């Protein structure tokens, strides 16, 4: 029987039960297999490679200091941050050493420079973005050079650097021992590695000797090349060797004879200048001219621009002078016109006065004529 609370509602079947059960669907209609529509363009199909995904996230781990809340604050709250690689950092509560800081900064700068070079090679980037990348690359390169030229032995002491190097060497030895225990040693491989390591050590020793002889800083090399008048170090060495070849005994005799001839010529020139008697005043004037030229040397660079500007302003100055002349002529004509107007005004006042007087006389004569006409009319009657 239907619920009595629905008895006053319309369209309610009171003679039927309140609960209805649908029959169970067949298994053919409840299959979990989803048949895609291959020809439907509205469905976006993503082709994801499991191998590429595995290689992308291989060796990465998640940090535990995360915050997924949406609270507002000064600190930016992010989720998990995936990081890769092995870092030899200081432990929790331990202070980072200067050597660890230096190595970490070098590694980060190398990674940043690699990312910038990769982004510069991208063809989709605009010229402005590439220019900004180049500026950042230059700044990072200079910072890297400064970091490489930093002498830790002078800054923090040779003992601290030696202790850091000893700890690094001990860690390396422990890793080598663990590797030897885990993997069987191959004699051929170890021999080649020893040859390579000895060769690398020899090259590093030669590089160190070259840096000691020439200098590790690029400023010294550029100063040497600039003083020698060469573009690179090889040309500077060649020019220095050529100059050193001139200092041989055979060349020194030739140089001495040439210098003797030059001294004789200089003495003859001094005698001629003393004979003319124009030495004191002439040298004084030459010195004054030289001082004037020296003082006006910074203005010489601005003179071409000033001349060009004066040439461009010449037409404007001519137009201004013509305008001033026309304005003066206009003032003179205006003054003459004002004088003519004043004289015409006086003449007009005189004409008006004469016209008024003549009009008054005419009126008097007309009155007299009227009176005579009246008298004549009376006589005629």
Curated annotation (Swiss-Prot):
Keyword Transport attached: no
UniProt-annotated stretches for the region Disordered: 15-39
Subcellular location field: Cytoplasm, Cytoskeleton; Membrane
InterPro entries: Dynamitin
Family, similarity comment: Belongs to the dynactin subunit 2 family.
Assembly mode: Subunit of dynactin, a multiprotein complex associated with dynein.
Record protein name field: Dynactin subunit 2
Lineage of the organism: Eukaryota, Metazoa, Ecdysozoa, Arthropoda, Hexapoda
């Amino acid at each position: 029987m239907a619920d009595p609370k629905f008895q006053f509602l319309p369209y309610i079947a009171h003679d039927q039960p309140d609960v209805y059960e649908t029959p169970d669907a067949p298994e053919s209609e409840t299959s979990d297999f989803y048949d895609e529509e291959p020809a439907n363009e509205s469905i976006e199909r993503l082709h994801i490679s499991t191998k590429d995904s595995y290689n992308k996230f291989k060796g990465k781990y998640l940090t535990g200091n995360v915050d997924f809340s949406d609270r507002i604050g000064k600190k930016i709250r992010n989720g998990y941050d995936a990081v890769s690689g092995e870092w030899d950092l200081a432990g929790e509560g331990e202070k980072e050493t200067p050597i660890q800081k230096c190595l970490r900064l070098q590694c980060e700068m190398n990674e940043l420079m690699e990312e910038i070079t990769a982004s510069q090679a991208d063809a989709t980037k605009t010229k402005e973005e590439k220019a900004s990348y180049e500026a950042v690359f230059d700044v990072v390169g200079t910072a890297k050079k400064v970091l490489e030229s930093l002498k830790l032995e002078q800054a923090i002491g040779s003992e601290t650097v030696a202790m850091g190097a000893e700890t690094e060497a001990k860690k390396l030895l422990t890793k080598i021992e663990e590797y030897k225990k885990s993997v069987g040693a191959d004699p051929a491989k170890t021999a080649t590695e020893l040859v390579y390591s000895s060769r690398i050590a020899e090259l590093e020793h030669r590089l160190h000797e070259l840096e000691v002889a020439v200098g590790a800083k690029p400023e010294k090399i550029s100063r040497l090349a600039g003083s020698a008048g060469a573009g690179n170090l090889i040309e500077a060495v060649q020019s220095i060797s050529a100059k050193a070849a001139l200092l041989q005994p055979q060349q020194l005799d030739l140089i001495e004879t040439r210098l003797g001839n030059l001294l004789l010529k200089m003495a003859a020139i001094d005698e001629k200048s003393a004979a003319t008697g124009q030495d004191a005043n002439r040298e004084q004037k030459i010195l004054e001219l030289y001082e004037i030229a020296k003082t006006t040397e910074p203005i010489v660079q601005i003179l071409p621009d000033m001349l060009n500007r004066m040439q461009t302003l010449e037409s404007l100055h001519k137009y201004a002078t013509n305008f001033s002349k026309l304005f003066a002529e206009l003032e003179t004509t205006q003054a003459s016109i004002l004088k003519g107007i004043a004289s015409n005004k006086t003449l007009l006042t005189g004409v008006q006065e004469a016209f008024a007087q003549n009009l008054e006389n005419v009126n008097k004569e007309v009155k007299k004529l009227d009176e005579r006409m009246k008298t004549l009319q009376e006589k005629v009657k």
